[in-house]
Regions:
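Structured alpha/beta reader/binder surfaces that contact nucleic acids or chromatin modification marks
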Residues: 1-130
């Protein structure tokens, strides 16, 4: 099952400040168990990041901010990234430090489609699950 969530800016700020992920575990929800693919996108006017990933079994696990934060940490997000792309007019996909423009896609479907096949060509493989 494919699920889409929003990662709040304050969690990205934690990465920018260099906080360790394991130090945040106490104050954030239980970790989710995930599949092998995921991506992130940011839209103009906010610093929120949209995170999509495939969940192995949604009945047993759920999406939470800590898991999304772990994903974003894999991308080496910097303050420059946040300032540059949050202020941009376009929607981008973030993949291991690379940014791919998604202007040719339907922006409305980015946030509502539970099975966004248009993004299947660009997976984020991280090799771990909780």
């Amino acid at each position: 099952m494919n699920i889409l969530i929003t990662l709040p800016k304050h969690l990205i700020d934690c990465i920018i400040r260099g906080e360790k992920l394991f130090e945040m575990r106490k104050s954030l929800p239980k970790l989710m168990k995930v599949g092998e693919d995921g991506f992130f996108a940011v839209e103009k006017g906010t610093s929120n990041v949209r995170c999509w990933c495939r969940v192995d079994d949604v009945r047993e696990t759920y999406i939470d901010h800590y898991s999304a934060l772990w994903y974003v940490s894999r991308l080496c997000v910097s303050e420059e990234y946040i300032e540059r792309y949050a202020a941009d007019n376009r929607v981008f996909l973030w993949k291991i430090g690379k940014v791919i423009e998604l202007s040719d896609l339907d922006r409305s479907s980015l946030f509502v489609d539970k099975n966004p096949q248009q993004f299947a060509y660009c997976p984020l493989s991280y090799g771990e699950s909780y």
